[in-house]
């Protein structure tokens, strides 16, 4: 009986309290008596003592005084301001929920289910303030791959077992349907999966295509019909440029838009008001120097194609200064764009 009382106390406090919404012992006793009218104050007091003595394990705490005078004649001890230290703060849950809510590749119906599960991790006060109507107002017109979570499960299992996978890789057509990139719709690419990462709202598989010796990455929401092959995964140290192992953090820092190519040292000059945007893109992996006259010099190490797209998007704020071949590529892209717009006006 005592063991079940401990569970009931934790359950009630977890559902109804947090540090900002504590509960009095007498209110806790009232909740318990809805299930067992015979339970008494002393039994509850002793059980709370047990839980509070192991607060690091039970997550049960109390604030304020340990005695609550209900009347001049009542000198019995009561705990006040009891609460359960929730595993997630409201801010942490909101951050997780918004990440799912605005994800561009999670099927709409799955968002509803996942967010419902996340809401259950909070107490009644959190759920009262977190309206599920918000998700149902979102448009359901994002093109989706219904196999996304199946893909994640299978890839995760393959990585745990150290096995290769086979997968059909697709592109999205103008009708928002997926079509295999190869003429043979049943052709499965043989891949060595190493990690799954999120970038720019999309989930990527960092992998190696088995008949090559370099690292690459595929959009997981563009993959279909994934199967686990009964073949051991290729050791990452066998890949070009990864003989010392695979540092996923380093890989992500050098692939800002998950483009293809080897990181290259690139220098550019930028308006100093662009510094916040540069930091948003490159994080701490940019080196700033010689900030004067409203300009700053910058150095990054990213694939040239990545930098090409970024520089074109920000051509009014940044000027690439090296390498020369990247400058030539940017000039060519700008000339081509200018020719198109000039032709439109003539």
What are these regions (language model features)?
Residues 245-346:
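Polybasic (Lys/Arg-rich)
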């Amino acid at each position: 009986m005592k063991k079940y009382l401990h569970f009931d106390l934790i359950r009630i406090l977890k559902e109804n309290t947090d540090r900002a919404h504590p509960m009095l012992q007498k209110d806790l006793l009232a909740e318990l008596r809805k299930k067992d009218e015979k339970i008494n104050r002393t039994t509850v007091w002793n059980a709370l003592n047990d839980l509070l003595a192991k607060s690091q394990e039970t997550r049960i705490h109390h604030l304020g005084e340990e005695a609550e005078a209900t009347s001049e004649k009542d000198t019995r001890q009561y705990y006040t301001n009891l609460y359960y230290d929730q595993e997630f703060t409201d801010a942490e849950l909101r951050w997780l929920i918004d990440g799912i809510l605005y994800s561009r590749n999670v099927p709409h119906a799955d968002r509803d289910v996942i967010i419902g599960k996340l809401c259950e991790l909070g107490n009644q006060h959190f759920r009262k303030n977190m309206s599920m109507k918000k998700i149902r107002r979102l448009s359901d017109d994002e093109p989706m791959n219904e196999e996304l979570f199946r893909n994640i499960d299978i890839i995760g299992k393959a990585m745990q077992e150290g096995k290769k996978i086979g997968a059909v890789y697709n592109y999205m057509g103008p009708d928002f349907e997926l079509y295999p990139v190869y003429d043979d719709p049943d052709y499965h690419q043989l891949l060595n999966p190493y990690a799954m990462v999120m970038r720019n709202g999309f989930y990527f598989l960092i992998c190696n295509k088995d008949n090559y010796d370099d690292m690459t990455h595929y959009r997981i929401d563009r993959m279909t019909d994934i199967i686990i092959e009964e073949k051991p995964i290729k050791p990452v140290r066998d890949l070009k440029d990864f003989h010392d192992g695979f540092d996923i953090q380093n890989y992500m820092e050098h692939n800002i838009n998950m483009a293809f190519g080897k990181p290259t040292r690139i220098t550019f000059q930028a308006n100093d008001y662009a510094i916040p945007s540069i930091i948003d893109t490159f994080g701490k992996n940019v080196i700033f120097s010689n900030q004067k006259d409203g300009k700053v010099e910058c150095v990054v190490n990213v694939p040239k194609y990545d930098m090409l797209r970024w520089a074109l998007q920000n051509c009014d704020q940044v000027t690439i200064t090296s390498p020369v071949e990247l400058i030539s590529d940017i000039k060519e892209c700008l000339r081509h764009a200018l020719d198109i717009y000039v032709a439109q006006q003539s």
